């Protein structure tokens, strides 16, 4: 799939998710974009919303978070604190372009989509908690841009509906990310085999949105067929934000990128044909050799013929055929046996 100038068929698409790791500072956001590029990210992703895009400014119990990193915080207050202000977007997209890193965003309401259109984004991202909103999904599908969907809390029925909507809107560029909507995610809760299930069941391109510590999961995900990896990124460990507890700093993210690139390199193309290096090593394969001096007319037997390394003699498949035949000439111990040596 083509996302901007990036082809996911050729390389795994690695996204640095900035989210709230700007910590309320535009300067921090711009520095993060530059650092993400240096760390090897293919794209920086932001989130485009106002608190009103996501929730109501209510003090009722329904709108108070219970448990986890954000325990007892009011939803509206959380999103007000974590947002990337509209007025930052122009500089964010401009900086990304200047740095040579792709940039796109997750909108959360119609107003956010309309705002983002002025930047002609290369793609859109639908967050896990918005995946059940069919009207919102359709608005995104109508934009005819590659769309990445986190599937963390979506049911199979909802995912099938997303596929149906994108088909109806004639938008074929859909990617499902396996995602566990827990912040942070325990490694035993990842269910990475779900990447394979998403690919097989929905026939879409797949990847991983990872909220676990470290980068074991992204490397394993690549081995399972992930073509997109999304991981939260921050400049350094001194940052305190709503997302910093499960984000990678520069050194960690760079190490993850290196590991992912090694993993995809190790996968190869899946062909079983021997490559040039393997063919060269065939010299150490077994072949048939004289294990004793053999006189002309002497019968080849288990006593004077062995299958040994290296491979300059007859292929071992001729061993049984050779036994019982007579030598056509004198053969010395250690000579590689040839077809001309027997009759």
UniProtKB/Swiss-Prot annotation:
One of its GO terms (molecular function) is N-acylneuraminate-9-phosphate synthase activity. GO terms for biological process: carbohydrate biosynthetic process; glycosylation. Gene3D superfamilies: Aldolase class I, Antifreeze-like/N-acetylneuraminic acid synthase C-terminal domain. CDD domains: SAF_NeuB_like. Pfam families: NeuB, SAF. Keywords: Metal-binding, Transferase. It catalyses: 2,4-diacetamido-2,4,6-trideoxy-beta-L-altrose + phosphoenolpyruvate + H2O = pseudaminate + phosphate. Its cofactor is a divalent metal cation. The keyword Transferase applies. Its EC number is 2.5.1.97. PROSITE patterns: AFP_LIKE. Residues 287-343 form the AFP-like domain. InterPro entries: AFP_Neu5c_C (IPR006190), AFP_Neu5c_C_sf (IPR036732), Aldolase_TIM (IPR013785), Neu5Ac_N (IPR013132), Nonulosonic_Acid_Synth (IPR051690), Pseudaminic_synth_PseI (IPR020030), SAF (IPR013974). Catalyzes the fifth step in the biosynthesis of pseudaminic acid, a sialic-acid-like sugar that is used to modify flagellin. Catalyzes the condensation of phosphoenolpyruvate with 2,4-diacetamido-2,4,6-trideoxy-beta-l-altropyranose, forming pseudaminic acid. Belongs to the pseudaminic acid synthase family. PANTHER family: N-ACETYLNEURAMINATE SYNTHASE, PSEUDAMINIC ACID SYNTHASE. This is Pseudaminic acid synthase. It comes from Campylobacter jejuni subsp. jejuni serotype O:23/36 (strain 81-176). The gene is pseI.
């Amino acid at each position: 799939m083509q996302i901007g100038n990036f082809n996911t068929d050729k390389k795994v698409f690695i996204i640095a998710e900035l989210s709230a790791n700007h910590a309320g500072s535009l300067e921090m956001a711009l520095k993060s974009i530059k650092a993400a590029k240096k760390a090897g990210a293919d794209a920086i992703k932001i989130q485009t919303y106002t608190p009103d895009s996501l929730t109501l400014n209510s003090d009722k119990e329904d709108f108070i978070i219970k448990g986890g990193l954000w325990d007892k915080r009011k939803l509206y207050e959380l999103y007000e604190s974590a947002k990337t202000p509209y007025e930052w977007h122009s500089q964010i997209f401009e900086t990304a372009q200047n740095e040579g890193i792709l940039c796109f965003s997750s909108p959360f309401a119609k107003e956010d989509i309309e705002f983002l259109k002025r930047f002609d984004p290369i793609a859109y991202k639908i967050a896990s908690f918005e995946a059940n909103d069919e009207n919102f999904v359709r608005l995104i599908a109508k934009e005819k841009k590659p769309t990445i969907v986190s599937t963390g809390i979506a049911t199979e029925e909802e995912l099938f509906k997303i596929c149906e909507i994108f088909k109806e809107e004639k938008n074929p560029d859909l990617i499902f990310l396996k995602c566990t909507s827990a912040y942070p995610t325990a490694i035993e809760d990842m269910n990475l085999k779900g990447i394979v299930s998403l690919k097989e069941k929905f026939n879409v391109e797949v990847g991983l949105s990872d909220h676990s510590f470290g980068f074991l999961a992204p490397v394993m995900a690549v081995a399972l067929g992930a073509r997109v990896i999304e991981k939260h990124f921050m400049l350094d460990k001194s940052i305190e934000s709503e997302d910093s507890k499960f984000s990678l700093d520069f050194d960690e993210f760079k190490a993850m990128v290196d590991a992912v690139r090694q993993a995809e390199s190790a996968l190869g193309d899946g062909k079983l044909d021997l490559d040039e290096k393997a063919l060269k090593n065939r010299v150490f394969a077994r072949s048939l050799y004289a294990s004793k001096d053999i006189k002309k007319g002497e019968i080849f037997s288990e006593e004077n013929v062995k299958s040994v390394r290296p491979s300059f003699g007859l292929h071992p498949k001729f061993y049984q055929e050779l036994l019982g035949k007579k030598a056509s000439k004198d053969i010395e111990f250690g000579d590689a046996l040839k077809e001309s040596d027997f009759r």
